[in-house]
């Protein structure tokens, strides 16, 4: 089972960019954020106003996303030897669910916690601070709550006594180097 490096954080804080660059550097696979995929699929629906950026997610949507995220992580982890890079995971989805539904739902955390087959103890979380410019890509709508989300991640990591690192440089090159340093420290 590979060591898993999970990049989490608010919107437009560089997670996906880091995941892509690190998967190339380490010649490994990376798990995409399924919540993002689901949002893109919702906006493809002709009954949704794509200009409104209102996804109208439900708890059932998040439960389905959690199972899909776990499945993707599991399938890709079977194809990696040493390292798997993840753009969010089901633990992170608990906070995204709270962000969109305005309430914490333990059902999502339970899906994360009960996924023994994912070997969650083998994960290193890397939280990206939202101190880089917000980039609107047509799907994002949370610029005003990036600090809140960052604080929620810290609170949840603390609550569950989880190991995590923070990438806080506003410089993208330094952020990448910090991520590499974290990975190197944890794969030796």
Per-region residue spans from a language model:
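Pre-Walker A (Motif I) flank of P-loop NTPase domains
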Residues: 2-4, 81
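Hydrophobic anchor at the beta1->P-loop junction of P-loop NTPases
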Residues: 7
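The conserved Walker
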Residues: 11
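Conserved lysine of the Walker
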Residues: 15
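Conserved substrate/cofactor phosphate-moiety recognition/catalytic segment
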Residues: 20, 24-68
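Glycine-rich phosphate-binding loop used to anchor ATP phosphates in small-molecule kinases
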Residues: 61-119
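A glycine- and Lys/Arg-enriched "phosphate-lid" helix/loop adjacent to the NTP-binding pocket
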Residues: 101-176
């Amino acid at each position: 089972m590979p060591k898993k490096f999970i990049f989490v954080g608010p919107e437009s804080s560089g997670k996906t960019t880091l995941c892509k660059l690190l998967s190339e550097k380490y010649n490994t696979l990376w798990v995409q954020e399924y919540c993002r995929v689901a949002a893109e699929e919702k906006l493809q629906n002709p009954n949704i106003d794509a200009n409104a950026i209102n996804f109208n997610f439900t708890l059932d949507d998040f439960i389905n996303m959690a199972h899909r995220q776990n499945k993707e992580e599991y399938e890709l982890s079977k194809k990696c030897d040493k390292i798997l890079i993840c753009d969010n995971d089901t633990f992170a989805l608990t906070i995204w669910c709270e962000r969109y539904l305005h309430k914490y739902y333990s059902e999502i955390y339970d899906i994360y916690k009960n996924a023994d087959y994912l070997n969650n103890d083998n994960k290193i979380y890397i939280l990206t601070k939202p101190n880089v410019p917000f980039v609107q890509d047509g799907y994002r709508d949370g610029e005003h709550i990036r600090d809140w989300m960052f604080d929620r991640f810290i609170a949840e990591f603390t609550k569950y006594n989880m190991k995590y690192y923070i990438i806080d440089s506003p410089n993208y090159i330094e952020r990448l180097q910090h991520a590499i340093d974290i990975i190197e420290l944890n794969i030796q």
